[in-house]
């Protein structure tokens, strides 16, 4: 295979990190040599803002239709917290392996009464940049539409939203500075030179069984023990502390265009299947209404693949009745390099889905038999 001919790249592959080289080769082999991204280096530089000056801006000037570095995201979080004191509270739940703070935004009208809560995390896997872009988009839309959108106002008045824009902060920075396709955390291993753990295989639920690897050099490495990663441990501790309030857990990933719910680790039906299936159906229907983009939905094990130690399964096993994982756009054409031009439509449609899931928490679930009308919704 002649990489120079089949990929038409304007850079030497030898200058790229090994994981990127392998990704390109496999990507090309899997598609018979078709060129989907003719200039990979240019696309990466465009998304990272390489060669351009990106100055800190006020919230009103913040561009939600480009990808942002961790520094920019955290500066934005501080600004959001400063300018919306009546609806936003910002706090840290711990520190990453490399010592960076793990910031969370709490959205919702301040009240003394008990409120249910929704947890949303993005950026568990470093290379999935559309995740942090969505978390920022959600915050922006929730705050800006609070005054005129009756649905959003009701959600903010009756629920709290815990938003973690970048879960895997160390890995996210590494994906900006060194390896665009980096997935894992950045923790060191005592026996191997390979670094990092898959933060979505490190949870204490069927840990390191099917769909996870015990080898530190693999992308799905489960870690030396459950919650070995300080990022995972911090989120797990927070959710345990607030499990009586948190009724929905939503983790944003990419890519595949799917909405998944438990179980990931086995082929079995969850006890509240009817309620969760109905919520998923309503969510993808709302998503489809924006631009006609089709999402598959169902149990992760049968819809995507079997995996163990996932945050979604852990959340469900720890008493959060509605646990979901989104796999956002696309289905492989751009993959992890989703163009910035698609941030707006991707986030707009996903916003509809998350609002629908959240609205469902304010209603009593009808536990009768739920059946999908495939003739009415053939795209699902």
Sequence positions of predicted segments:
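M14 metallocarboxypeptidase catalytic domain recognition
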Residues: 1-380
